Amino acid sequence: IHRRDNHLSVGFLGISHLLPALTKCGQNELAFALLEQKGNPGWLYSVINGATTIWERWNSYIAETGTFGDVSMNSFNHYAYGSIGQWLYRTVLGIQTGENTDESGYHKIFLTPSWGGALSFAKGEQETPFGKITSSWEKKENSIVYHCTIPANTTAHLSLPASDHNSVQILEGAAIADTAVSGVADFELVSGSYTFKIC
């Protein structure tokens, strides 16, 4: 990745695994660098060239020259590289469901938001059978403010990137501090709205 100046070099089959693998291996900043790559190939390259959907080719249209890619393979609404959406939801917003039967279907919610790169904020929601989950964070001058809502009849386990619980201030909600291990502060949440400040 570094030899290619933080450009992608995988195809349709590898793209869905790349950012999650980097995150899992502790290379989240590198994953953010790939997300924020403005050159070709890269997700923002398409956006800079006018994309509002995921294109089949990174260079389906080049705004500066007004040219289109090979018309035999040039869909402007093609999921192939769309796995970035899953990474944004599961990693940047941190919205996940449990894998055990009693946790599935968002009965038990796992929130593991992650910030990095040049992103200054992230905000999203997930509709579930129990109601809407929201997750958002914003970088402030010397802190990060994280907000979430947990729907009725569910519980959530929140893991915030923080050195310990002392670096996390609860601004809204009655979160119960759980553990703090290796740069992560954990909390147990019931339905309601919560706001945290991480210093």
Which residue ranges define each predicted feature?
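Conserved small-residue packing positions in alpha-helical repeats and bundles
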Residues: L18-L19
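Non-catalytic C-terminal accessory modules of carbohydrate-active enzymes
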Residues: E29-C199
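Solvent-exposed loop and edge beta-strand segments that line ligand/cofactor-binding
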Residues: I1-I15, T67-H78
